[in-house]
Amino acid sequence: MAKPAKRVAVTGAAGQIAYSLLFRIANGDLLGKDQPVILQLLDLPQAQGAVKGVVMELDDCAFPLLAGVVITDDPKVAFKDADVALLVGARPRSKGMERKDLLSANAEIFTVQGAALNEVASRDVKVLVVGNPANTNAYIAMKSAPDLPKKNFTAMLRLDHNRALSQLAAKSGKPVASIEKLAVWGNHSPTMYPDFRFATAEGESLLKLINDDVWNRDTFIPTVGKRGAAIIEARGLSSAASAANAAIDHVRDWVLGTNGKWVTMGIPSDGSYGIPEDIIYGVPVTCENGEYKRVEGLEIDAFSREKMDGTLAELLEERDGVAHLLKN
């Protein structure tokens, strides 16, 4: 018997990331090849025509799993009974815009969306914030949805995780699929800290295999941190397809499990690893039965502490920058 359809809300539905994302969701890549989905697409009033065009293309693919599509500019319609909410739309930074202005503009969007999720979404809704600054936008949405469990709100660090995996595979000569136990700590920004001290490839320690502190410090960490900027420089456009792919990976693993493998998610801190409670911070997790669980008890050396504190300082600054815009 066919499963009942799951409702997947996607914001910024007329945008580039959504264009790479929606067809894969409709194809079963997000929730499984036997799980029908209803797409609930949100974008601004002036983008409704463009969303309709995307939906025409979705129709033309005749996806067996696509059980319905809703197009709206009202968050309460988009998030109604949503099982998954992918918050892709955000205010991009325009020329001459200060970071604090960007934070304020996004706080406005994510307080409204958090409140709408609070009011109408499934109580088990899995929320992934992709729109930047993703960690702080997720924090704002979480704080604006007091009736939903905090653990439902996550930010995307999977793109950083996947970028780090590919750099490690290239450096070590090992297949990317063989690399396990990679962690990426902190904010989805150039300050985040990709950490392969615990990583293995085909059972061997990557730290011993690579054995190059200078490469780690001067090449690996900055390359992963600045990869988005490098892609814009090369292509003239931001990394939309790889971001969409990372969003699929993040939610698929959260829903369907990781079989004990580590992945990175930005999740509300419980105070572990010296990160203040509620800060949405990238940590290694495993997923099982629709729940994520942080990897506990990892040793933090002096270099790692410095890196983790550096990215935390940025997150605290962002949090303080939006505090006056939040009710609680």
Swiss-Prot record:
Gene3D superfamilies: Lactate dehydrogenase/glycoside hydrolase, family 4, C-terminal, NAD(P)-binding Rossmann-like Domain. SUPFAM superfamilies: LDH C-terminal domain-like, NAD(P)-binding Rossmann-fold domains. The keyword 4Fe-4S does not apply. Keywords: NAD, Oxidoreductase, Tricarboxylic acid cycle. Its EC number is 1.1.1.37. NAD(+) binds at residues 12-18, 106, 113, 130-132. InterPro entries: L-lactate/malate_DH, Lactate/malate_DH_C, Lactate/malate_DH_N, Lactate_DH/Glyco_Ohase_4_C, Malate_DH_type2, NAD(P)-bd_dom_sf. The active site is at 188 (proton acceptor). HAMAP family: Malate_dehydrog_2. Substrate binds at residues 93, 99, 132, 163. The keyword Oxidoreductase applies. One of its GO terms (molecular function) is L-malate dehydrogenase (NAD+) activity. Belongs to the LDH/MDH superfamily. MDH type 2 family. It catalyses: (S)-malate + NAD(+) = oxaloacetate + NADH + H(+). GO terms for biological process: malate metabolic process; tricarboxylic acid cycle. This is Malate dehydrogenase. Catalyzes the reversible oxidation of malate to oxaloacetate. It comes from the Bacteria. CDD domains: MDH_chloroplast-like.
